Amino acid sequence: MNMSKAEAFWQLTRMNRPIGSLLLLWPTLWALFLAADGLPDWHVLIVFVLGVVFMRSAGCVINDFADRKVDGHVKRTANRPLPSGLISSKEALSLFAVLVVCSFLLVLTMNTLTIMLSGIGIVLAIAYPFMKRVTYLPQFVLGLAFSWAIPMAYAAESNQVPPEAWLLFVINALWTIAYDTQYAMVDRDDDVKIGIKSTAILFGRYDKTIIGLLQLSVLALLIVLGSQLALSGIYYWGILAAAGFFVYQQWLIKGREREACFKAFLNNNYVGGLIFIAISASVLI
């Protein structure tokens, strides 16, 4: 395998762009620290961090496989490994299978409840890329997929999935829909031409307003979560800081320019990190 092939596989898994892994990792860490009410078990923590990396990469591979015939018509994705011919469909599917197997082998070291829940996570990861052809709400499916690690984390750490886990699940799903709509705004013009559906297209001129409402819902539910779990004042300062980043994102997307919308999407990494700091500080201090 020559260097260009190695680089193509690296790009296919998005290892060169860790933003997706981080957006999946933050809520997983929220759940682990809340479930443990402090520092989670080290074995569980390592399994979930590695699982996030493997499954996010698997999701990117199956996404590019599903989009291989349309990516060449989109400015941002035309040079991806599959549409450019550097990697074949068979090679992509083989890599996807390897990544899923690696993830499942990690899960097998967890308890029975976690193993059972993992099957749903795999189905969601496979389903999401194909939703863009049948519904204008693929971001909703991504919200479910990116949130499924939350009940799994609670199951692994405490062998149960309490109501607070599902509240956190909803919070993260709403946040995911908001930031992935920002991401979809980048490709909206191209997607309309080639028949790809998204919430950015569905929301139309109400996109910024709906994103704002989703962000407000996230903040409100985070406050409810903090109240239910009696988290300390540090937690609420973190939520306030996250609100500031949401305001900044609204400012970025006000003109709907591609680069500004992508910058707003990337900014969500800070939101996830802030909430993690707020949660971990509250349960550890």
Swiss-Prot record:
The keyword Magnesium is annotated on this UniProt entry: yes
Pathway membership, UniProt: Cofactor biosynthesis; ubiquinone biosynthesis
Chain segments annotated as transmembrane: 19-39, 42-62, 82-102, 104-124, 136-156, 166-186, 210-230, 233-253, 265-285
Entry EC number(s): 2.5.1.39
GO cellular component: plasma membrane
Keywords, ordered alphabetically: Cell inner membrane, Cell membrane, Magnesium, Membrane, Transferase, Transmembrane, Transmembrane helix, Ubiquinone biosynthesis
Membrane topology per record: Multi-pass membrane protein
Classification via Pfam families: UbiA
InterPro entries listed in its UniProt record: HB_polyprenyltransferase-like, Prenyltransferase, UbiA_prenyltransferase, UbiA_sf
Record's subcellular location: Cell inner membrane
CDD domains assigned to the protein according to its UniProt record, in alphabetical order: PT_UbiA_COQ2 (cd13959)
Catalytic activity: all-trans-octaprenyl diphosphate + 4-hydroxybenzoate = 4-hydroxy-3-(all-trans-octaprenyl)benzoate + diphosphate
Entry's Gene Ontology BP terms: ubiquinone biosynthetic process
Cofactor: Mg(2+)
Single annotated GO MF: 4-hydroxybenzoate polyprenyltransferase activity
Functional summary from the UniProt entry: Catalyzes the prenylation of para-hydroxybenzoate (PHB) with an all-trans polyprenyl group. Mediates the second step in the final reaction sequence of ubiquinone-8 (UQ-8) biosynthesis, which is the condensation of the polyisoprenoid side chain with PHB, generating the first membrane-bound Q intermediate 3-octaprenyl-4-hydroxybenzoate.
Protein family membership: Belongs to the UbiA prenyltransferase family.
UniProt-recorded name of the protein: 4-hydroxybenzoate octaprenyltransferase
Gene expressing this chain: ubiA
